[in-house]
Every structure is written in C-alpha cells, then in structure tokens.
C-alpha cells in the first residue's frame, strides 16, 4: 500500500453519493473528511485478505477490485467493485476477521478510514451506524 495525496473535492463527491453518509451535515462531512487518508495499490495486489483482522474501511476512488471468498479448497469470485463503491465495513462492524479477499484488478486508489476514526464517526452519527448495520446484515446473508 502506498500513501498518496487526494483531492478533497473528489472525496466529498463520493461521500455525498454514498447513501449512508448522505444524512451528514456539512460540518459532519468535513469532520469525516479530516479523518480519511488515501492509499493506492498496484494491479494484482491484495488490498485486504480473508481471515485477517479488519482495521480500515475503503472507498474506491479509481480502479477496479474483485471480491474473492475462500471456502474449503476453492476460491470464488463473488463481485467486482468500481469507483464510488466501498468495502471493509463488515469486519469493522462485527469485529470478526475479514470475510473476503479484495484484489486490485488494475492500479487503484482508495480513500481509507481507519477503525478508530470509523468508530468515532459511527458514535457521533447514529443514522450512519444504523444504515451500515443494515448493509452488513444484507451482505452477510448473501455469503
């Protein structure tokens, strides 16, 4: 993972499109943005690995990733994610190991919110926390 600089305007646009952040007021959005970092991964790199402890939530800024789940002796590609989509929330909400491996299918950049900051945002914004819990249970049922 490489740390990179990012465009705050682009980040604000992505956050406004991310439905569970849409309820945030401008000052809350600014607070959220102040906690976000940027990172990039090269094509073929594992962004997160199934079974590892989760420590961050990712919003895709550029590129494309694939979602892989390993069961017994097989690995299955279950999804592809594109800019403005997110991943990594499940392990942060459940405090369980990562439920999937995410691979960069091309050089990709991300906006990253680490666990401590993620938890602070959820504590300050119950509507965001509630929506993320709903998404968590929805995704968990699909797996």
Model-derived segments and spans:
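Cytosolic regulatory regions built on CNB/CRP/Popeye-like sensor folds
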Residues: 1-143
């Amino acid at each position: 993972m490489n740390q990179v600089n990012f465009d705050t305007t682009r980040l604000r646009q992505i956050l406004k499109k991310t439905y569970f952040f849409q309820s945030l007021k401008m000052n809350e959005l600014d607070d959220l943005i102040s906690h976000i970092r940027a990172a990039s991964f090269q094509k073929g790199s594992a962004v997160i690995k199934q079974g590892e402890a989760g420590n961050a939530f990712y919003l895709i800024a550029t590129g494309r990733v694939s979602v892989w789940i390993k069961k017994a002796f097989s690995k299955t590609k279950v999804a592809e994610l594109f800019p403005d989509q997110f991943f990594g929330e499940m392990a942060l909400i459940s405090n369980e190991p990562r439920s999937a491996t995410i691979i960069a299918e091309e050089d990709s950049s991300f906006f990253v919110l680490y666990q401590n900051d993620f938890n602070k945002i959820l504590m300050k914004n119950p509507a965001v926390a509630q929506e993320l819990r709903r998404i968590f249970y929805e995704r968990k049922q699909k797996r």
